[in-house]
Every structure is written in structure tokens, then in C-alpha cells.
């Protein structure tokens, strides 16, 4: 067995290719094919299932295989997973993305998730997650504040999300959706999937609302911006109520049956809401530009993902020195 493990990295590509291309070969090879984890330990499929099933089975009885594609770049995510008692596979081979898809088809009630595709509590869902104690207005406000401080990255889009992850977790975490990332990886290897390859990378910027630094930003933003933002939000709510009434009044009517004055009134109110939202966004962006901690938290999350480069990295270093 030891000699086989020593040779596995050299023959892995050929074994995986055979398993992917020949059903009968898969049936034979599944008994001796090995999986390698980030601690450089090797397991057969059955051995690995036995290793993880006690701790990596979610609330829906699915067995969750957590994997990394780069042990160095994804080091922080791997360490978080290990701190939970999870084992992380290393799937960095040329055919591993396809091999993962094959195993998901063959292994009953099993899913493969990349270690950086979500927060750790969502990778292996054991119970219902803690609710975030922010209302809709607070979420909208903090979304604008954090999103305004994300530097422009080529072919990358960010969605700001909020999770209650506990005081010990990082204040801001970046994850990438498993499905879209896998589709983009496969598009690089398969003709006819250029659609996914041309799409921008989609990332989640997750704000941990229970971390002291995130709490500080939220509390200070509400305190410092309350006087300017509250009247705008109040006016937006009043306009939205009026818009809802106009839409309800025209519900079920044909376009020609709705009075021109009502159509015009609806358009004007929607324009007013857009204008007020723009004003609110500008005020919050101006505030965030002056609040060094917001940009510092965003940049730290980007840095941990090897996504902070060029001018943004230079500014981060300069800001870090100033804040010491």
C-alpha cells in the first residue's frame, strides 16, 4: 500500500481518465483509486467515507466532501475547516473538476463543495443558522457602505451579504458560488461552454455582524449618518406606499383603461424614489470614503483571497501604516 501511495500522484491522471471514460473501468477502479487530503494522507473512496461520515453529514443526511484546489492560496479557509474537525481533500489535478462531477453522480447522497465556496457553517449545515439582527433599512445602508469600498476588479462582481458567524470568525469573508465557479472551470476545458467563461466571476462579500469590528462600523454609521439618512428613508417609504396604492388601483386593468394622469403620477413617483436612493447612496459613499476601517476590512478580505493587487494593495499598505 505504501508503494502504491508513493506512485499515486504520477498515475492519478491516467486512473481518473479511465474512470471518466469507461464505466467498467470505474467499477473496478473505485476499489483502489485514492483520494489525497491537504495533510498528504491517502484514502480509498470507502476509507474516506468512513473517515468523514460522522462529522461531515449535514442535517439532510448528505455526506459533504470538502475540497481545495490550491493548498497555499486557500490556506486560511482550510484552517477554518480543520478547526471544525473537518477533513479537506486536495483536488488540484487536471481532471479533478470532471472527476468530482463523476463522484457526485456515483456516490449516493454525497456532495462536493470547495472550501472557499461558502462560510464554514453553510458547507456542512448541521442546524438552522443564527438570524442576523439587522432590519431591511440597516442592510440596505450597510450594503452601500461596504460595496462602495470594493476596488474595481476586472471581470469580477460582488454581492454584499450578512451572516451572524460569531465573534471568533473573521469580520469580512469572501466566498465564490460553487456552481458558477465550477462551470467556469469546466468551460476552460470544454469547447461549447464559452458562455460561462466570458461571464464575470461572482463573489460574495460576507459581513460577520457579530464580530466587534463589524459591529463598530454598523453602530458608527447609524450614529453618524442618522440625521441625514432618516428623512430620506422616510420619504422613500412614503413614496413606495403611494406607488403600491397606484399599482393596486390599476391591477387587472388593460393599459388603455388606466388614466393617463395615474400613469404619469406613477412614473413621477418612481423617478423621485430613484433620485432619493441615488442621494442616499452618495451620502453613504462619502461617509465610507472617510471611514478607514470599512476599506481596511474589505481589503483584508481581498488580501486573504489573493485579490488585492496594484494600486489597491499599495493604498492598503499605506493605510495600514497610518493606522498602526
Predicted regions and their residues:
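Conserved GHKL (Bergerat-fold) ATPase module
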Residues: 1-324
Amino acid at each position: 500500500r505504501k508503494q502504491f501511495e508513493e506512485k499515486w500522484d504520477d498515475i492519478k491522471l491516467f486512473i481518473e481518465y479511465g474512470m471518466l471514460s469507461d464505466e467498467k473501468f470505474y467499477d473496478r477502479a473505485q476499489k483502489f483509486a485514492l483520494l489525497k487530503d491537504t495533510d498528504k494522507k491517502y484514502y480509498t473512496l470507502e476509507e474516506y467515507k468512513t473517515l468523514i461520515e460522522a462529522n461531515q453529514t449535514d442535517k439532510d443526511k448528505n455526506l459533504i466532501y470538502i475540497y481545495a484546489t490550491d493548498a497555499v492560496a486557500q490556506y486560511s479557509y482550510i484552517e477554518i475547516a480543520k478547526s471544525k474537525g473537518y477533513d479537506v481533500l486536495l483536488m488540484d489535478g487536471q481532471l479533478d473538476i470532471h472527476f468530482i462531477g463523476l463522484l457526485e453522480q456515483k456516490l449516493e447522497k454525497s456532495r462536493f463543495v470547495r472550501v472557499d465556496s461558502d462560510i464554514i457553517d453553510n458547507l456542512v449545515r448541521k442546524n438552522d443558522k443564527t438570524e442576523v439582527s439587522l432590519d431591511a433599512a440597516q442592510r440596505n445602508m450597510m450594503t452601500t457602505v461596504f460595496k462602495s469600498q470594493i476596488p474595481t476588479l476586472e471581470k469580477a462582481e460582488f454581492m454584499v451579504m450578512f451572516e451572524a458567524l460569531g465573534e471568533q470568525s473573521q469580520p469580512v469573508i469572501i466566498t465564490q458560488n460553487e456552481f458558477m465557479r465550477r462551470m467556469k472551470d469546466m468551460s476552460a476545458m470544454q469547447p461549447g461552454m464559452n458562455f460561462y467563461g466570458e461571464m464575470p466571476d461572482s463573489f460574495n462579500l460576507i459581513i460577520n455582524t457579530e464580530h466587534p469590528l463589524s459591529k463598530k462600523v454598523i453602530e458608527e454609521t447609524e450614529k453618524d449618518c442618522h440625521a441625514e439618512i432618516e428623512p430620506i428613508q422616510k420619504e422613500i417609504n412614503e413614496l413606495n406606499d403611494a406607488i403600491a396604492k397606484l399599482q393596486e388601483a390599476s391591477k387587472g386593468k388593460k393599459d388603455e383603461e388606466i388614466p393617463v394622469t395615474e400613469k404619469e403620477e406613477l412614473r413621477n413617483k418612481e423617478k423621485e424614489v430613484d433620485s432619493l436612493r441615488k442621494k442616499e447612496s452618495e451620502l453613504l459613499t462619502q461617509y465610507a470614503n472617510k471611514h478607514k476601517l470599512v476599506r481596511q476590512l474589505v481589503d483584508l478580505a481581498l488580501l486573504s483571497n489573493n485579490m488585492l493587487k496594484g494600486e489597491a494593495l499599495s493604498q492598503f499598505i499605506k493605510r495600514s501604516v497610518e493606522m498602526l
